Amino acid sequence: MGGDFSKSGREQAMYHYAVSDVLPVLLHLQDEFRQSAFSPYCTELQITPGNPDFPPICLKTRDGHTVRLIGKIDRVDICRDGAQKWVRVVDYKTGEKVFSLGHLLYGLDMQMLIYLFSILSEGTALSDAQPAGVLYLPAGKVKSDQKRGASKTPEKKRNETYQMNGVLLRDAHLLTLMEQNGEGIYVPGKLDAKGELDTKKGTFLTQEQMRNLRKYVLEQLVDMAERVYHGEIDALPLELPKEDPCKFCAFSNICGNSELCRQRIPYGDSRMQEKKMMEILEELAEEENN
Protein backbone atom coordinates (compact mmCIF):
# COMPACT_ATOMS: atom_id res chain seq x y z
CA MET A 1 0.00 0.00 0.00
CA GLY A 2 3.06 2.27 -0.11
CA GLY A 3 2.64 5.51 -2.10
CA ASP A 4 -0.35 6.72 -4.08
CA PHE A 5 0.73 5.35 -7.46
CA SER A 6 -1.95 3.28 -9.19
CA LYS A 7 -4.33 3.37 -6.23
CA SER A 8 -7.98 3.82 -7.05
CA GLY A 9 -10.11 6.28 -5.12
CA ARG A 10 -11.82 3.37 -3.39
CA GLU A 11 -8.50 1.85 -2.30
CA GLN A 12 -7.30 5.16 -0.93
CA ALA A 13 -10.55 5.65 0.98
CA MET A 14 -10.30 2.14 2.47
CA TYR A 15 -6.68 2.76 3.44
CA HIS A 16 -7.42 6.04 5.22
CA TYR A 17 -10.45 4.48 6.89
CA ALA A 18 -8.28 1.64 8.26
CA VAL A 19 -5.60 4.05 9.48
CA SER A 20 -8.17 6.22 11.27
CA ASP A 21 -9.45 3.12 13.10
CA VAL A 22 -6.00 1.83 14.06
CA LEU A 23 -4.64 5.01 15.65
CA PRO A 24 -7.02 5.12 18.67
CA VAL A 25 -6.29 1.44 19.39
CA LEU A 26 -2.54 2.09 19.30
CA LEU A 27 -2.87 5.07 21.62
CA HIS A 28 -4.89 2.97 24.05
CA LEU A 29 -2.33 0.15 23.97
CA GLN A 30 0.45 2.66 24.52
CA ASP A 31 -1.30 4.02 27.61
CA GLU A 32 -1.94 0.53 28.96
CA PHE A 33 1.59 -0.82 28.55
CA ARG A 34 3.07 2.37 29.97
CA GLN A 35 1.61 1.50 33.38
CA SER A 36 1.53 -2.33 33.18
CA ALA A 37 4.11 -4.88 34.33
CA PHE A 38 3.01 -7.11 31.44
CA SER A 39 4.65 -6.74 28.04
CA PRO A 40 4.20 -8.52 24.70
CA TYR A 41 6.08 -11.80 24.47
CA CYS A 42 4.95 -12.63 20.95
CA THR A 43 2.34 -11.62 18.37
CA GLU A 44 0.76 -13.95 15.83
CA LEU A 45 2.18 -16.90 17.77
CA GLN A 46 1.80 -20.12 15.80
CA ILE A 47 0.90 -23.35 17.57
CA THR A 48 1.85 -25.91 14.93
CA PRO A 49 3.85 -29.15 14.60
CA GLY A 50 6.54 -27.09 12.84
CA ASN A 51 7.10 -24.82 15.86
CA PRO A 52 9.45 -26.58 18.32
CA ASP A 53 8.83 -23.93 21.00
CA PHE A 54 5.05 -24.30 20.89
CA PRO A 55 3.98 -27.66 19.47
CA PRO A 56 0.26 -28.53 19.56
CA ILE A 57 -1.35 -30.53 22.33
CA CYS A 58 -2.17 -34.03 21.10
CA LEU A 59 -5.25 -35.73 22.54
CA LYS A 60 -6.39 -39.33 22.10
CA THR A 61 -10.00 -40.39 21.75
CA ARG A 62 -11.19 -43.62 23.33
CA ASP A 63 -11.30 -45.30 19.93
CA GLY A 64 -7.69 -44.39 19.11
CA HIS A 65 -7.99 -41.25 16.99
CA THR A 66 -5.54 -38.37 17.51
CA VAL A 67 -6.61 -34.74 17.83
CA ARG A 68 -4.00 -31.99 17.42
CA LEU A 69 -4.83 -28.51 18.65
CA ILE A 70 -3.25 -25.97 16.29
CA GLY A 71 -3.87 -22.26 15.88
CA LYS A 72 -2.56 -18.72 15.97
CA ILE A 73 -2.68 -16.34 18.95
CA ASP A 74 -2.99 -12.61 18.29
CA ARG A 75 -0.84 -11.67 21.27
CA VAL A 76 0.87 -13.35 24.21
CA ASP A 77 1.89 -11.14 27.15
CA ILE A 78 4.33 -12.04 29.89
CA CYS A 79 5.19 -10.66 33.33
CA ARG A 80 8.14 -11.64 35.51
CA ASP A 81 7.36 -11.01 39.16
CA GLY A 82 10.33 -12.19 41.19
CA ALA A 83 10.66 -15.92 40.63
CA GLN A 84 7.14 -16.11 39.21
CA LYS A 85 6.34 -15.86 35.52
CA TRP A 86 2.79 -14.98 34.43
CA VAL A 87 1.29 -15.37 30.96
CA ARG A 88 -1.93 -14.06 29.45
CA VAL A 89 -3.30 -14.32 25.92
CA VAL A 90 -5.08 -11.46 24.18
CA ASP A 91 -7.44 -11.71 21.23
CA TYR A 92 -8.33 -8.67 19.12
CA LYS A 93 -12.00 -8.39 18.17
CA THR A 94 -13.32 -5.92 15.60
CA GLY A 95 -16.87 -6.74 16.68
CA GLU A 96 -18.43 -6.97 20.11
CA LYS A 97 -17.29 -9.94 22.19
CA VAL A 98 -18.25 -10.66 25.79
CA PHE A 99 -16.74 -13.70 27.47
CA SER A 100 -19.15 -15.89 29.42
CA LEU A 101 -18.01 -18.69 31.70
CA GLY A 102 -21.42 -20.29 31.24
CA HIS A 103 -20.87 -20.61 27.48
CA LEU A 104 -18.24 -23.26 28.20
CA LEU A 105 -21.11 -25.62 29.00
CA TYR A 106 -21.88 -25.65 25.27
CA GLY A 107 -18.37 -25.64 23.85
CA LEU A 108 -18.33 -21.87 23.25
CA ASP A 109 -15.65 -19.35 24.33
CA MET A 110 -13.06 -22.14 24.55
CA GLN A 111 -10.64 -21.15 21.79
CA MET A 112 -8.49 -18.70 23.74
CA LEU A 113 -8.46 -20.96 26.79
CA ILE A 114 -7.23 -23.79 24.56
CA TYR A 115 -4.44 -21.53 23.33
CA LEU A 116 -3.49 -20.49 26.87
CA PHE A 117 -3.34 -24.05 28.13
CA SER A 118 -1.45 -25.14 25.00
CA ILE A 119 1.43 -22.68 25.34
CA LEU A 120 1.83 -23.51 29.04
CA SER A 121 1.91 -27.26 28.49
CA GLU A 122 4.94 -29.43 29.24
CA GLY A 123 7.57 -29.17 26.54
CA THR A 124 6.81 -25.59 25.46
CA ALA A 125 9.00 -22.50 25.88
CA LEU A 126 6.60 -21.23 28.58
CA SER A 127 6.02 -24.45 30.50
CA ASP A 128 7.50 -22.82 33.64
CA ALA A 129 4.91 -20.01 33.62
CA GLN A 130 1.49 -19.76 35.24
CA PRO A 131 -1.80 -18.71 33.57
CA ALA A 132 -2.88 -15.15 34.34
CA GLY A 133 -5.96 -15.19 32.14
CA VAL A 134 -7.58 -14.70 28.77
CA LEU A 135 -8.56 -11.27 27.48
CA TYR A 136 -10.56 -10.00 24.52
CA LEU A 137 -9.68 -6.52 23.26
CA PRO A 138 -12.33 -4.66 21.20
CA ALA A 139 -10.50 -3.13 18.25
CA GLY A 140 -13.29 -1.38 16.35
CA LYS A 141 -14.19 2.29 16.11
CA VAL A 142 -14.35 4.51 19.19
CA LYS A 143 -17.93 4.72 20.47
CA SER A 144 -19.70 7.86 19.30
CA ASP A 145 -22.86 7.56 21.39
CA GLN A 146 -22.07 10.45 23.72
CA LYS A 147 -25.21 12.35 24.72
CA ARG A 148 -25.66 16.09 24.31
CA GLY A 149 -24.07 17.95 27.20
CA ALA A 150 -21.79 15.07 28.20
CA SER A 151 -18.22 16.05 28.99
CA LYS A 152 -16.25 12.86 28.42
CA THR A 153 -12.71 13.44 27.21
CA PRO A 154 -11.45 11.65 24.08
CA GLU A 155 -9.21 9.56 26.34
CA LYS A 156 -12.14 8.44 28.50
CA LYS A 157 -14.24 7.54 25.47
CA ARG A 158 -11.29 5.59 24.08
CA ASN A 159 -10.82 3.70 27.34
CA GLU A 160 -14.52 2.79 27.51
CA THR A 161 -14.44 1.49 23.94
CA TYR A 162 -11.30 -0.62 24.33
CA GLN A 163 -11.68 -1.97 27.86
CA MET A 164 -10.94 -5.68 27.69
CA ASN A 165 -13.13 -8.48 28.98
CA GLY A 166 -12.42 -12.11 29.74
CA VAL A 167 -11.41 -14.29 32.67
CA LEU A 168 -8.52 -13.66 35.08
CA LEU A 169 -6.81 -15.44 37.92
CA ARG A 170 -8.32 -14.51 41.28
CA ASP A 171 -5.33 -12.62 42.65
CA ALA A 172 -5.33 -8.96 43.72
CA HIS A 173 -1.56 -8.60 43.34
CA LEU A 174 -1.70 -10.03 39.83
CA LEU A 175 -4.37 -7.48 38.93
CA THR A 176 -2.06 -4.63 40.00
CA LEU A 177 0.64 -6.07 37.75
CA MET A 178 -1.78 -5.66 34.86
CA GLU A 179 -3.18 -2.33 36.00
CA GLN A 180 -1.10 -0.46 38.53
CA ASN A 181 -3.88 1.40 40.34
CA GLY A 182 -6.47 -1.39 40.04
CA GLU A 183 -9.20 0.93 38.76
CA GLY A 184 -10.42 -1.37 36.00
CA ILE A 185 -9.72 1.03 33.14
CA TYR A 186 -7.95 -1.51 30.94
CA VAL A 187 -8.68 -4.97 32.35
CA PRO A 188 -12.02 -6.49 33.47
CA GLY A 189 -11.38 -6.25 37.18
CA LYS A 190 -10.75 -3.69 39.92
CA LEU A 191 -9.79 -3.36 43.56
CA ASP A 192 -12.19 -2.14 46.24
CA ALA A 193 -11.50 0.54 48.85
CA LYS A 194 -9.63 -2.01 51.00
CA GLY A 195 -7.33 -2.96 48.14
CA GLU A 196 -8.98 -6.34 47.73
CA LEU A 197 -10.27 -7.86 44.50
CA ASP A 198 -13.84 -6.82 43.71
CA THR A 199 -15.16 -10.15 42.44
CA LYS A 200 -18.43 -8.55 41.31
CA LYS A 201 -16.60 -6.56 38.64
CA GLY A 202 -15.28 -9.45 36.54
CA THR A 203 -14.85 -13.19 36.08
CA PHE A 204 -12.14 -14.70 38.28
CA LEU A 205 -10.90 -18.22 38.94
CA THR A 206 -8.57 -19.57 41.60
CA GLN A 207 -5.46 -21.52 40.58
CA GLU A 208 -7.25 -24.77 41.41
CA GLN A 209 -10.27 -23.76 39.34
CA MET A 210 -7.98 -22.81 36.45
CA ARG A 211 -6.32 -26.25 36.59
CA ASN A 212 -9.69 -27.96 36.60
CA LEU A 213 -10.90 -25.72 33.79
CA ARG A 214 -7.99 -27.00 31.71
CA LYS A 215 -9.09 -30.56 32.45
CA TYR A 216 -12.70 -29.73 31.56
CA VAL A 217 -11.80 -28.01 28.27
CA LEU A 218 -9.59 -30.87 27.09
CA GLU A 219 -12.23 -33.44 28.03
CA GLN A 220 -14.81 -31.48 26.05
CA LEU A 221 -12.52 -31.44 23.01
CA VAL A 222 -12.09 -35.21 23.15
CA ASP A 223 -15.86 -35.60 23.46
CA MET A 224 -16.42 -33.31 20.45
CA ALA A 225 -13.89 -35.25 18.37
CA GLU A 226 -15.54 -38.56 19.23
CA ARG A 227 -18.96 -37.24 18.23
CA VAL A 228 -17.61 -35.96 14.90
CA TYR A 229 -15.90 -39.29 14.16
CA HIS A 230 -19.21 -41.02 14.89
CA GLY A 231 -21.07 -38.77 12.44
CA GLU A 232 -22.84 -36.53 14.96
CA ILE A 233 -22.70 -33.26 13.00
CA ASP A 234 -26.34 -32.16 13.09
CA ALA A 235 -27.12 -28.55 12.12
CA LEU A 236 -28.37 -27.77 15.62
CA PRO A 237 -27.05 -24.35 16.70
CA LEU A 238 -27.33 -23.00 20.22
CA GLU A 239 -30.06 -20.42 20.78
CA LEU A 240 -28.49 -17.28 22.24
CA PRO A 241 -30.01 -13.81 22.76
CA LYS A 242 -29.07 -11.17 20.15
CA GLU A 243 -27.00 -13.68 18.16
CA ASP A 244 -27.69 -15.30 14.80
CA PRO A 245 -25.57 -18.48 14.57
CA CYS A 246 -26.25 -18.75 10.83
CA LYS A 247 -25.31 -15.17 9.93
CA PHE A 248 -21.89 -15.97 8.46
CA CYS A 249 -22.46 -19.62 7.56
CA ALA A 250 -21.73 -20.54 3.93
CA PHE A 251 -23.88 -23.67 4.11
CA SER A 252 -27.17 -22.25 5.39
CA ASN A 253 -28.94 -23.09 2.11
CA ILE A 254 -28.15 -26.80 2.27
CA CYS A 255 -28.20 -27.65 5.98
CA GLY A 256 -31.96 -28.18 6.13
CA ASN A 257 -32.30 -25.90 9.15
CA SER A 258 -31.72 -22.43 7.72
CA GLU A 259 -34.94 -21.17 9.32
CA LEU A 260 -33.66 -22.34 12.72
CA CYS A 261 -36.65 -24.58 13.34
CA ARG A 262 -34.40 -26.74 15.51
CA GLN A 263 -32.01 -25.28 18.07
CA ARG A 264 -30.33 -26.28 21.29
CA ILE A 265 -31.93 -24.46 24.19
CA PRO A 266 -29.44 -23.22 26.81
CA TYR A 267 -29.84 -23.98 30.49
CA GLY A 268 -31.44 -20.99 32.26
CA ASP A 269 -30.03 -17.47 32.03
CA SER A 270 -26.36 -16.44 31.98
CA ARG A 271 -26.15 -16.33 35.78
CA MET A 272 -27.49 -19.87 36.10
CA GLN A 273 -25.11 -21.07 33.39
CA GLU A 274 -22.10 -19.59 35.18
CA LYS A 275 -23.25 -21.13 38.46
CA LYS A 276 -23.56 -24.52 36.76
CA MET A 277 -20.06 -24.19 35.30
CA MET A 278 -18.61 -23.35 38.72
CA GLU A 279 -20.35 -26.43 40.15
CA ILE A 280 -18.67 -28.57 37.50
CA LEU A 281 -15.27 -27.14 38.46
CA GLU A 282 -16.00 -27.91 42.11
CA GLU A 283 -16.90 -31.50 41.19
CA LEU A 284 -13.63 -31.87 39.30
CA ALA A 285 -11.77 -30.55 42.34
CA GLU A 286 -13.47 -33.12 44.57
CA GLU A 287 -12.56 -35.90 42.15
CA GLU A 288 -8.94 -34.75 42.16
CA ASN A 289 -8.79 -34.59 45.96
CA ASN A 290 -10.36 -38.03 46.32
Ranges and model annotations:
Residues 1-290:
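Structural signature of nuclease core domains in nucleic-acid processing machines
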